Amino acid sequence: MYYGLTAMKKKSVAVVIISNGPGELTTWVNPVVDEFNKIKKSLCDDDKHDFTLRLVLVPCPNATGKEFLVANSWNKFELITKSKSFWKLLIKPHSFADWPKKGIVIFLGGDQFWSVLLAKRLGYLNITYAEWVSRWPQWTDEIAAMN
């Protein structure tokens, strides 16, 4: 269902990445997470932001079913939620983990509406990466566009 629950520590901010398939994981999620970790390492100890990286895989007809195993092998997330558990997470997020009061949901693959729903449910900000079209701009806090 999920990974890393016992290893999680109390963090002040959650960075939740929404994604769906193998292409999005390797071309978008992995580099974005690497950048977050570079930023975290570059700050001196007094300035470090205490955040947790979490990955939520969402239902997708193009998924291979191995996305969880691939993301888990990177050892970059404190929590990974499988796509088959997405609806349970959306309905009862606190049954999966403790969620910091502050956070951000970043859409990097799947249906953009999933990130809108999860961000609203958790009370977090939402950033949608839109390669071509942002489908829910009225409910998105920020849009990151390719062009």
Enumerate the language-model features and the residues they cover.
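Active-site and donor-binding regions of nucleotide-sugar-utilizing enzymes
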Residues: 17, 21-22, 26-147
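Extreme N-terminal starter segment of soluble prokaryotic enzymes
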Residues: 10-15
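N-terminal amphipathic/basic-hydrophobic helices that include classical n-h-c signal peptides
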Residues: 1-7
